[in-house]
Amino acid sequence: MNASQTKPENVILPSSNMMYPFMTLDDNAEIVHSEMGKDGRVKVYIEKPDAKDGFHRATCYLPSYTWEDIFGFSDEEINRYKKVIESTAHLIMEFSQKGGFNNAANL
């Protein structure tokens, strides 16, 4: 951020941009997550390779389940990913505080 830019009062920037692998689905979609921010939010990012578009992507923020930046996925795919995230959110939230799955599992 340079001197001419200001950060809005209500935005808390994460301390790190580190993303941790969480799960690869049977359709080759990769789910990764960030560390938990000071505001308690965790960024969950889904990405899937596509021959035409390069990658399809979507971002979900926990614990609010706010979705944004959805590109290339069908409604059916997004509904499936929503179910996956909702059913595993407790694990993602835990791992986000422990440096990802590998660190939480002492691997």
Identify the role of each PLM range:
Residues 31-74:
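A short, structured beta-strand/loop element
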Residues 71-107:
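Acidic, low-complexity intrinsically disordered segments
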